[in-house]
């Protein structure tokens, strides 16, 4: 089953959280739709969300653990470990998690990544109430 490793970066480009999921859209909706387990200050600090796609959940778990120990993100409890990676995994390209596909002209309205995530979270919550 396809899985993802994702990371939150702050305005300075620092990795502040690393996680993994099998459904990136649902997970972002949970994080930013009020069901996230992280401190609110983490979500307020997010300036960029990046992800990598893996063929298996086991691969994503290995990379998640590797990146947490490599970057020691502020909001990962595992990142507080004193151990550092002793293996070197292949670095993959991080893709930016976003919804906008076209450049928006100045003055035009646009829907950004986090707005879209909140909309997904709202729709998901409505379906949960109906079901």
Residue ranges and their predicted role:
Residues 1-18, 22-102:
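Structure-specific nucleic-acid interaction/processing domains
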Residues 100-131:
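C-terminal single-pass membrane-anchor helix
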